[in-house]
Amino acid sequence: MKIVEVKSKNGTNFMILDGNNEPIVDAVRYLKYLDSVKKSLNTKKTYAYALKNFFVYLESKKICYKEVSFDNFVDFIRWMKTPFEYENVLSYHRKEKSISPKTINLTMTVVSNFYDYLYRSKKLDVNFYDFMHMESKYSKKYKSFMHH
C-alpha cells in the first residue's frame, strides 16, 4: 500500500495504490473530489495518508472497505493507538508509536468524510457519516463516538 503523487497541468493530487500497485478507485475519486472543491495541497496529502492508514488496517483484517461495520471503526481507533498488538512477530528494536488523540480524531474525520462521499455518490447504502456523528441523547453538547 502506498501513496503516489500525481502532477498534471491542473496541479498536484494523490493516488492510493493497494498491495498489487492497483489504484483504490473510490479513494482516488474522493481525492480528486477534494481537488475540485479547492482543498489545499497539504490537506489533500493529509487526507491521502489518513485514508492509506485506514486501508492498511482493512487489508490487515481482510475487510473490504464497502463492508465495514461500526465495530470496525472502533477497532481501527484501537489499532491506531496500539498498532503492534496486531503483529505476529515481536521485535526488540521496535519503538512504540505514539499517536495523539488529535491525530486519531483527524484520521477518523477523514475516514467519515470518505464514507459520506461514498454514500452521497450512491456507492454505499449505509450512511456511516450520520451514524458516526449522531448527537447523544444524554447531553446537549455534541460528542461523537470517537470522543476520548
Language model features with spans:
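Basic/aromatic DNA-contact patch characteristic of tyrosine site-specific recombinases
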Residues: 1-41, 45-56
